[in-house]
């Protein structure tokens, strides 16, 4: 590995900032899957896209629209301290656990940033890259506060 790469958090190293587990044939996966548990993407923007696709599935398929609902599914108690994760995200984005999130960049960008920070201990991506990945995920989905 290149100098310093092995010291990066696993999710950043894998260009998978949401630490998405293997199992789905995501667009943008690297040809070599060097991690036995988590997906490795060729570009971080595609890992961000996958993270957002999951959040959109939570919203439109499972009707998860509060931080409590979203994080309880994202970080289940069988694998995480879900309540601590919810508290962290709520503090980061300044909402209450049961506040409903609008289906907009304004609401989901802070959520995505906080998930990345929680998963990796830091959030190294600029807003431009995050928004690009998020918009790639939103293709085909409605946007706006009325989309639920």
Language model: regions and residue ranges:
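Cell-wall polysaccharide-cleaving catalytic domain and substrate-binding groove, primarily
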Residues: 1-148
């Amino acid at each position: 590995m290149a100098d310093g790469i092995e010291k990066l958090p696993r999710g950043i190293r894998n260009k998978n900032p949401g630490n998405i587990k293997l199992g789905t044939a995501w667009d943008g996966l690297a040809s070599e899957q060097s991690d036995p548990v988590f997906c490795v993407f060729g570009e971080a923007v595609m890992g961000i896209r996958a993270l957002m696709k999951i959040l959109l599935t939570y919203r439109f398929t499972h009707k998860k629209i509060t931080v409590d609902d979203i994080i309880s599914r994202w970080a289940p108690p069988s694998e995480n301290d879900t309540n601590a994760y919810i508290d962290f995200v709520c503090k980061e984005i300044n909402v209450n656990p049961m506040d409903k999130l609008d289906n907009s960049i304004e609401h989901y960008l802070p959520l995505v940033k906080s998930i990345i920070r929680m998963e990796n201990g830091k959030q190294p991506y600029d807003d431009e890259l995050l928004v690009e990945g998020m918009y790639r995920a939103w293709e085909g989905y409605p946007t706006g506060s009325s989309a639920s």
